[in-house]
């Protein structure tokens, strides 16, 4: 595995990614970070965002991450995510519906708890939608 990293993205439901990659860029809670083979070991919390990686052929691929943790070792990155979806698996129609529901909940302003949940739902929907739309524009997976 010279020059490559094993990337594993796992949720409570399934293994989303388990493959050898060249690089990983993740949405850390303290800022985005990149990993190459031989990286110093560390743990990081992840925020909602896009995890990008370059596969063995050099193709850039992306995964939606809804928070979690990343363990980085010299030749392996393990992401434990609350939820995750490959860009190619995101359903743009479902994203649009989730976006509309979140916007309606924000406009209703029923109570503070619902308002905060609606803000988080809106951020998730916007990130997923952005990723789904970028798939169409750039052909990436």
Swiss-Prot record:
Belongs to the ATPase epsilon chain family. F-type ATPases have 2 components, CF(1) - the catalytic core - and CF(0) - the membrane proton channel. CF(1) has five subunits: alpha(3), beta(3), gamma(1), delta(1), epsilon(1). CF(0) has three main subunits: a, b and c. Its main location: membrane. This is ATP synthase epsilon chain. It is found in: Cell inner membrane. It is a peripheral membrane protein. Produces ATP from ADP in the presence of a proton gradient across the membrane. It comes from the Bacteria. GO terms for cellular component: plasma membrane; proton-transporting ATP synthase complex. The keyword Metal-binding does not apply. NCBIfam families: ATP_synt_epsi, PRK13446.1. It comes from Desulfatibacillum aliphaticivorans.
